[in-house]
């Protein structure tokens, strides 16, 4: 705008200069015109006309010049605008050229990446084809193995049925011998006749004793400060071992209710106990992740079995050997221990925490009860799972084997007690009572030594006794007020012992 104003001002100055010059020239020639006008009066009118005509032409020239000046100003402005637009276009072209160069570089890079990805895809396709080939081969092998496994299972089931039939025949013979024994009192003759079938002779220390139905509290003992978590009798004896939260193991005479001795050295609460078949050692599973083995005669710790990484909640010892012990802990392992060597000889791994275990009569199979409610059977030598049964809807708290080894009792947090046939793993009895509620994940039930009764404690302090053959309650024992944690039956038929959460132990006859 400033430049346009300057241009208009310059044009106006030029017009004024021309008018001034015209006036000066007109004034300068006025005398000559006057002198000539005299002789030329005759031509005055002609010259006047020409003058007027020239003035008219001059005015037209001025007007044309003014229009040209205005047009010039417009053209100059348009030229400057076009120049600015041209500069903008040049800048835009430069930016577009740079962007084009960048896009070309990106295109080159993407092309290289595409080639690399294509090569990778080709390699993956080749690997996929190879894996598919391997998968087809493995599938074929699995199908073949499944077929062979099915055949082996069928053969094993057939063999199992045959073994069960033979065992049933032996049991029938055994029951017949027991009937004769009870009728005629020929105990010695009966034991010799059935020796090698179910029972061993007196040298093996197992013999038949008829159990009595407990009804009376013979002794009420304050055994431990805090809860008493485990009790166990010596084999074929009335001597009772108790273990509690005070980390002590105590030995009691159940006839008089007096303390025989105390065993110290445990670094944790006693959660479970077992006594060797020769009654020389007692083993305690503790919350300190260890097992402690005491020599009963000296009262000293013979072994400290280390290897578990969490609390050891269950332990059992071989029925025939005083050498082999199994334990279960919350590190989800079962360990086999050699007491002669004092260390672990085998470890079994599983996924659900184990609350209770027991060994079979031959010491080759471990029965374990787990938090998922299942009963599992393990080959202790190979560590392989032999079988699994869904026995309870909640955690299994106790696993007990009958004296003849044909039945196994499991108790669960669903307040149900199941009796399984160890040969077929079928439930042959289910025991429950409206007032019987288990107090903890380690509430222990037990079977009487003659395999006729089952005893289990309840959270209300009572102990329920069922007839195994009839499935009905034959006795309810009420003396304790705290939740019952465990029960144990003496191998000589009586007494039955129960321990509660306050550390009291009652013996029942």
Curated annotation (Swiss-Prot):
UniProt xrefs under InterPro entries: ATG16 (IPR045160), Autophagy-rel_prot_16_dom (IPR013923), G-protein_beta_WD-40_rep (IPR020472), WD40/YVTN_repeat-like_dom_sf (IPR015943), WD40_repeat_CS (IPR019775), WD40_repeat_dom_sf (IPR036322), WD40_rpt (IPR001680)
GO biological process: autophagosome assembly; protein transport
WD repeats by residue range: 223-262, 265-304, 307-347, 349-388, 391-430, 437-478, 480-509
Keywords: Autophagy, Protein transport, Repeat, Transport, WD repeat
Gene3D superfamilies: 1.20.5.170, YVTN repeat-like/Quinoprotein amine dehydrogenase
CDD domains referenced in this protein's UniProt entry, alphabetically: Atg16_CCD, WD40
Species, as recorded: Arabidopsis thaliana
Function description: May play a role in autophagy.
Any Pfam family hit: WD40
Lineage: Eukaryota, Viridiplantae, Streptophyta, Embryophyta, Tracheophyta
Family affiliation: Belongs to the WD repeat ATG16 family.
Protein name (record): Autophagy-related protein 16
């Amino acid at each position: 705008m400033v430049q346009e104003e300057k241009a208009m001002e310059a044009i106006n100055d030029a017009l004024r200069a021309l008018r001034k010059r015209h006036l000066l020239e007109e004034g300068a020639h006025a005398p000559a015109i006057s002198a000539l006008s005299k002789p030329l009066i005759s031509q005055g009118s002609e010259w006047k006309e020409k003058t007027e005509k020239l003035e008219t032409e001059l005015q037209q020239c001025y007007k044309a010049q003014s229009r040209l000046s205005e047009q010039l100003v417009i053209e100059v402005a348009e030229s400057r605008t076009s120049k600015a637009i041209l500069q903008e276009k040049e800048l835009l072209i430069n930016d577009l050229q740079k962007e084009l160069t960048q896009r070309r570089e990106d295109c080159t890079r993407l092309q290289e990446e595409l080639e690399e990805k294509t090569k990778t895809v080709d390699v993956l396709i080749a690997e996929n084809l190879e894996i598919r080939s391997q998968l087809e081969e493995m599938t074929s092998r699995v199908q073949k193995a499944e077929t062979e496994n099915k055949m082996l299972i069928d053969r094993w089931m057939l063999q199992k049925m045959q073994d069960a039939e033979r065992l049933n025949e032996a049991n029938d013979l055994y029951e017949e011998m027991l009937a004769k024994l009870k009728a005629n009192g020929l105990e010695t003759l009966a034991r010799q006749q059935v020796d090698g079938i179910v029972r061993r002779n007196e040298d093996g220390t197992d013999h038949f004793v008829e159990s009595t139905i407990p009804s009376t509290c013979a002794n009420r003992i304050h055994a431990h400060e805090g809860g008493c978590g485990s009790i166990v009798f010596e084999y074929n004896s009335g001597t009772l071992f108790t273990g509690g939260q005070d980390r002590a193991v105590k030995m009691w005479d159940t006839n008089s209710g007096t303390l025989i001795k105390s065993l110290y050295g445990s670094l944790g609460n006693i959660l479970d106990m077992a006594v060797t078949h020769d009654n020389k050692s007692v083993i305690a599973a503790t919350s300190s992740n260890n097992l402690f083995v005491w020599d009963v005669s000296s009262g000293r710790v013979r072994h400290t079995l280390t290897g578990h990484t969490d609390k050891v909640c269950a332990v059992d010892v071989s029925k025939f050997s005083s050498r082999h012990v199994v334990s279960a802990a919350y590190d989800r392992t079962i360990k086999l221990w050699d007491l002669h060597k004092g260390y672990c000889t085998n470890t079994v791994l599983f996924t659900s925490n184990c609350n209770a275990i027991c060994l079979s009569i031959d010491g080759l199979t471990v029965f374990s009860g787990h938090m998922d409610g299942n009963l599992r059977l393990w080959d202790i030598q190979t560590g392989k799972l032999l079988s699994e049964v869904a026995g309870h809807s909640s955690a299994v708290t106790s696993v007990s084997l009958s004296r003849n080894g044909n039945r196994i009792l499991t108790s669960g947090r669903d307040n149900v007690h199941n009796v399984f046939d160890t040969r077929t793993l079928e439930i042959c009895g289910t025991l429950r009572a409206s007032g019987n509620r288990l107090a903890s994940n380690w509430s222990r039930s037990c079977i009487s030594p003659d395999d006729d009764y089952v005893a289990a404690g309840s959270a209300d302090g009572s102990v329920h006794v069922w007839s195994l053959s009839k499935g009905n309650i034959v006795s309810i024992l009420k003396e304790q007020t705290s939740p019952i944690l465990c029960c144990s039956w003496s191998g000589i038929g009586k007494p039955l012992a129960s321990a509660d959460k306050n550390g009291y132990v009652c013996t029942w006859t």
